[in-house]
């Protein structure tokens, strides 16, 4: 059977971009995009090999942010505007490790969605 020839699309990378950090209760997903919103590099705690309850730890977020920023810096990204979404543990450590990796953080914006009393939340856990 012939292999389908798919051409990998090339994303135009500028020196200024955006970092979208989604920190849920179960996982942390970090996407570095250009100004248009096209993804330059992405990483998550699950992609880094963490499983189960270890995925939502500050250390897992740090490892994911370092992996993501390494690829973006090779592509030529230098400054990012950070958008943080969700209530997860690794929010601050992901931002800190982006900065320590050599990418300058210009501003941090919290875009966590807040309901105007929409859906009923899940019932309380009884352990």
UniProtKB/Swiss-Prot annotation:
Single GO MF descriptor: structural constituent of ribosome
InterPro entries assigned: Ribosomal_uS11 (IPR001971), Ribosomal_uS11_bac-type (IPR019981), Ribosomal_uS11_CS (IPR018102), Ribosomal_uS11_sf (IPR036967)
Keyword Ribosomal protein: yes
Top-level taxon in the UniProt lineage: Bacteria
Any one of the GO BP annotations: translation
Pfam families noted in UniProt: Ribosomal_S11
Keywords carried by this UniProt record: Ribonucleoprotein, Ribosomal protein, RNA-binding, rRNA-binding
GO CC terms: ribonucleoprotein complex; ribosome
PROSITE patterns according to UniProt: RIBOSOMAL_S11
Signal peptide: none
The protein's assembly and partners: Part of the 30S ribosomal subunit. Interacts with proteins S7 and S18. Binds to IF-3.
Job of this protein: Located on the platform of the 30S subunit, it bridges several disparate RNA helices of the 16S rRNA. Forms part of the Shine-Dalgarno cleft in the 70S ribosome.
Family classification: Belongs to the universal ribosomal protein uS11 family.
HAMAP family: Ribosomal_uS11 (MF_01310)
UniProt name for this protein: Small ribosomal subunit protein uS11
Native organism: Flavobacterium psychrophilum (strain ATCC 49511 / DSM 21280 / CIP 103535 / JIP02/86)
Gene symbol of the encoding locus: rpsK
């Amino acid at each position: 059977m012939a292999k389908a020839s798919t051409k990998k699309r090339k994303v135009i990378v500028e020196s200024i971009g955006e970092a979208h950090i989604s920190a849920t209760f179960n996982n942390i997903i970090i996407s570095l995009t250009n100004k248009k919103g096209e993804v330059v590099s992405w990483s998550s705690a699950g992609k880094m090999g963490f499983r189960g309850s270890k995925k939502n730890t500050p250390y897992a977020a740090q490892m994911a942010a370092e992996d993501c920023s390494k690829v973006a810096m090779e592509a030529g990204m230098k400054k990012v505007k950070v958008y943080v979404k969700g209530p997860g543990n690794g929010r601050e450590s992901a931002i800190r490790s982006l900065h320590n990796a050599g990418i300058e953080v210009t501003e941090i914006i919290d875009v966590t969605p807040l309901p105007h009393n929409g859906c009923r939340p899940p019932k309380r856990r009884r352990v």
